[in-house]
């Protein structure tokens, strides 16, 4: 960009394809006795805001300014907070398509960018994919500025750092890397920044796409990052020393490094008394184990180890099985596929009919299958319990991994019996211990053993949770060095 207004406008018109882009606008006017132009994208700016705070002051500037003074005079005349100078045409175009207005004047090298964004966006609403029992009923939305504000309202401290950067080679999008300066593990932060620098893609559509570009083991069945739309959950992980990634246009945020326990815990556990939190965690753990192992164990015992079952139960199964034309493994596979189909359909249909569709479809199909003597009733109960267990898993990605593992474990149990199940679970545990998330052990703090809070599978009292993080060695890794309940004379 040079000082020739006509040449600069021609260059911008070419880069913006104004001949075929009707929403790329330019207005010419005079300010400080010089010809000037303002470029903006209709729909991304507030027209009233630009007219009142930008154009009106500049059009009424009748003074004369030299080429070296014009930029400073415009800055003084316009009462806007965010004003930046840019000299590269690509940077100027990036400012325009992000909702800024760009002012060019004759004799001024480069352009001045003014933040006059006013695009319509969704307001703050409760989380749509994570139910809230206790805690704030606020969820992230598609505006990165709103999402950053929600986190800063929960953690009002200058130690909360939010580094803004652009990601995407052809169509960049804003990305914010947030962490607590005094709690984050510096090696994990450096590793994340290095990975972000090495991401080369034309455009990042969603936070889920970014997850696939950053995770340590892209072919692993288990997710290695936490995705959430609850600000309180993201804030609690920031306090643990983890890093939160916010992408403009995505209502979820990405948290890493993460462990398996982070995928099983919920903010409601922390907001509840430790006895209640322990009960809820044990129920979720039971649901996960039922979802993963119950169908395979049923098939293995009925097919390979019937002598291990009670006589009355075995007699009932054999009597009903005699009238069914399919084998037990095939029955189980068909019913699991049917229940997964019902669950997927209930998600895709409109929300007002989704829950009704899931309940009615499950009841009708199950009853029809039993009456048609395609399956026996006990198998329907096993499939229903395992399906409920998979929906009790709080993380959506982990729930999908459990449902896929359920089918793999069913295959192992159908071929090798209980021995196949034991071998599969052993291989799963070995794989779990070898996984990492941003270089941190995914099975932390159990493997490898390290100092940690007692808050693992069970919910321990809050005042016993002194360690800040499991996944790194931050400078300040203690949440409290004194007694949290200092008033309690019993020393708790």
Identify the role of each PLM range.
Residues 288-308:
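Hydrophobic alpha-helical segments embedded in or immediately adjacent to the lipid bilayer
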Residues 297, 310-492:
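Generic detector of multi-pass transmembrane helix bundles and their immediately adjacent loops
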Residues 1-293, 311, 431-492:
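Membrane-embedded alpha-helical signal segments
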């Amino acid at each position: 960009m040079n000082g020739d207004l006509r040449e600069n406008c021609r260059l911008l018109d070419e880069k913006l394809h104004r001949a075929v882009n009707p929403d790329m606008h330019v207005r010419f006017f005079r300010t400080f006795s010089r010809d000037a132009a303002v470029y903006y994208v209709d729909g991304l700016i507030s027209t009233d805001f630009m007219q009142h705070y930008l154009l009106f002051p500049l059009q009424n500037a009748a003074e004369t300014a030299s080429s070296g003074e014009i930029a400073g005079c415009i800055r003084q005349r316009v009462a806007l907070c965010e004003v930046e100078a840019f000299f590269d045409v690509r940077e100027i175009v990036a400012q325009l398509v992000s909702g800024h207005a760009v002012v060019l004047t004759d004799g001024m090298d480069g352009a001045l960018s003014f933040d006059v964004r006013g695009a319509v966006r969704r307001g703050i609403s409760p989380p749509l994919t994570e139910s809230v029992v206790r805690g704030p009923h606020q969820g992230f939305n598609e505006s990165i500025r709103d999402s950053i504000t929600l986190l800063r309202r929960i953690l009002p401290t200058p130690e909360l750092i939010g580094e803004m950067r652009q990601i995407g080679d052809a169509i960049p999008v804003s990305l914010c890397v947030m962490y607590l300066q005094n709690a984050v593990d510096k090696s994990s932060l450096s590793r994340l920044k290095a990975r972000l620098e090495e991401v080369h893609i034309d455009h990042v559509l969603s936070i889920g796409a970014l997850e696939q570009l950053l995770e340590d083991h892209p072919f692993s069945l288990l997710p290695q990052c936490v995705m959430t739309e609850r600000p309180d959950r993201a804030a609690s992980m920031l306090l643990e020393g983890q890093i939160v990634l916010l992408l403009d246009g995505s209502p979820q945020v990405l948290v890493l490094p993460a462990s398996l326990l982070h995928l099983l815990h919920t903010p409601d556990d922390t907001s509840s008394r430790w006895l209640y939190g322990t009960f809820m965690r044990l129920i979720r753990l039971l649901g996960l184990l039922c979802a993963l192992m119950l169908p395979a164990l049923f098939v293995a015992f009925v097919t390979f180890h019937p002598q291990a079952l009670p006589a009355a139960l075995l007699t009932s199964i054999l009597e009903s099985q005699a009238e069914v034309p399919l084998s037990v493994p095939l029955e189980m596979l068909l019913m699991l596929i049917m229940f997964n189909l019902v669950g997927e359909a209930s998600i895709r249909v409109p929300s007002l009919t989704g829950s009704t569709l899931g309940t009615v479809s499950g009841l009708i199909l199950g009853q029809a299958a039993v009456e048609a003597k395609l399956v026996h009733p006990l198998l329907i109960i096993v499939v229903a319990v395992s399906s409920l267990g998979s929906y009790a898993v709080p993380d959506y990605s982990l729930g999908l991994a459990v449902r896929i593992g359920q089918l793999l474990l069913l295959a192992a149990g159908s071929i090798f019996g209980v021995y196949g199940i034991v071998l599969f679970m052993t291989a799963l545990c070995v794989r779990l211990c070898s996984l990492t998330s941003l270089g941190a052990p995914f099975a932390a703090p159990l493997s490898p053993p390290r100092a940690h809070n007692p808050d693992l599978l069970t919910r321990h009292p809050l005042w016993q949770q002194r360690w800040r993080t499991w996944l790194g060695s931050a400078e300040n890794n203690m949440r409290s060095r004194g007694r949290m309940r200092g008033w309690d004379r019993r020393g708790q």
